[in-house]
């Protein structure tokens, strides 16, 4: 029987999510990878236990995380029931809908029918009455934004989610969504977007600045650029690496001579800071107050332990920030 560490809140940093009452850990655990059908049940359980013992209270899922679709939620639901039932009120559990989930015209995008049905399925898979945060997972070019945001509002008012968020939105669409949700008095608190030293899209499309101005939180996914911002590829492609095992999101052709030179330069900087490259890349995400939390993925508990160490070293000098910017642009 699992008993959580009595020291779990001693070192983790908790940041306010925009101007809401919600606090999130600086480091959150994402279940996008390594919680699917073929994942080792004991390893999944060990990762969740390790995370919670280190103060990671936020566990992030989506309806189609796996593979197979839904399997991450199903596996997490089993872990919740077996280990975390006494701690449910200490946890922030989030899920999403917006990408392809089931066949036919009602299993994708942002219609009211899809979002409400999908969350009902997610709650059943996880054995929950509600989630803490429910996200629309991507912008829908065809469904009126009023319908999509209205569905999120209905979900909160039905008690199936406490807060709502949006994921993969750009700045202008986020502003429109926020205005609709504010009129509905629906608690929209957070944006989830890809963000890393190598991917500055939310800086370029205005979302990062605008979210801060509007009092909305940001949680960053893919902070390590699917593993590029680590030292694992500096000497070839390891047999157990994501490129070798699962080439869906990162391909070997990403490892160009120029990219490897950038990684090498960043790795040297990290060593000078007393960090691994992965740790520095995570710390960089949290360099200012615009970003509430950074989502990490893990394949084993030891990675979570290493990543959480960033809470002791999240400050950068202006010289360091300038150098990182230059390296990321290829100016070595």
Put a short name on every predicted segment.
Residues 38-51, 110-126, 174-178:
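Short, acidic/polar
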Residues 18-36, 94-107, 130, 135:
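N-terminal small/glycine-rich loop or linker at the start of catalytic domains
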Residues 2-9, 143-332:
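Beta/alpha (TIM)-barrel catalytic core signal, keyed to glycine-rich beta->alpha loops juxtaposed to Asp/Glu
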Residues 36-40, 64-72, 140-144, 171-172, ...:
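Acidic-and-aromatic substrate-binding clefts and catalytic sites of carbohydrate-active enzymes
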Residues 39-43, 71, 75, 106-114, ...:
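Alpha-helix N-cap and loop-to-helix initiation/capping positions
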Residues 123-143:
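Active-site groove signature of glycoside hydrolases
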Residues 25-29, 59-61, 91-95, 134-136, ...:
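Hydrophobic faces of well-ordered beta-strands that scaffold small-molecule active sites
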Residues 1-91, 157:
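N-terminal binding-site loop/beta-alpha segment at the start of enzyme catalytic domains
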């Amino acid at each position: 029987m699992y008993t959580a560490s009595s020291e779990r809140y001693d070192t983790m940093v908790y940041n306010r999510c925009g101007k809401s009452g919600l606090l999130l850990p600086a480091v959150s655990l994402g279940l996008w990878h390594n919680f699917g059908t073929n994942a080792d049940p004991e390893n999944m359980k060990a990762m969740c236990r390790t995370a919670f013992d280190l103060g990671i209270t936020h566990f992030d899922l989506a309806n189609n995380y796996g593979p197979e679709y839904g399997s991450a939620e199903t596996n997490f639901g089993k872990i919740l029931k077996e280990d975390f039932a006494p701690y449910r009120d200490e946890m922030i559990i989030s899920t999403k809908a917006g990408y392809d989930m089931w066949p036919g015209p009602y299993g994708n995008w942002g219609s009211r029918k899809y979002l409400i049905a999908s969350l009902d399925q997610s709650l059943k898979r996880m054995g929950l009455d509600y989630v803490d945060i429910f996200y629309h997972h991507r912008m829908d070019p065809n469904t009126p934004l009023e319908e999509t945001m209205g569905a999120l509002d209905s979900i909160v008012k039905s008690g199936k989610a406490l807060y709502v968020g949006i994921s993969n939105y750009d700045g202008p669409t986020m502003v429109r969504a926020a205005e609709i949700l504010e009129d509905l008095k629906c608690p929209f608190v957070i944006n989830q977007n890809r963000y890393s030293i190598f991917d500055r899209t939310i800086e370029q499309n205005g979302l990062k600045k605008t979210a801060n101005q509007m009092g909305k939180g940001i949680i960053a996914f893919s902070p390590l650029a699917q593993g590029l911002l680590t030292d694992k590829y500096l000497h070839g492609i390891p047999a157990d690496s994501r490129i070798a095992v699962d080439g869906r999101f990162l391909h070997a052709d990403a490892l160009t001579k120029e990219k490897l030179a950038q990684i090498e330069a960043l790795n040297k900087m990290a060593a000078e800071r007393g960090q691994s490259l992965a740790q520095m890349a995570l710390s960089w995400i949290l360099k200012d107050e615009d970003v509430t939390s950074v989502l990490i993925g893990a394949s084993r508990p030891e990675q979570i332990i290493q990543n959480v160490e960033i809470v002791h070293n999240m400050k950068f000098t202006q010289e360091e920030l300038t150098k990182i910017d230059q390296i990321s642009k290829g100016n070595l």
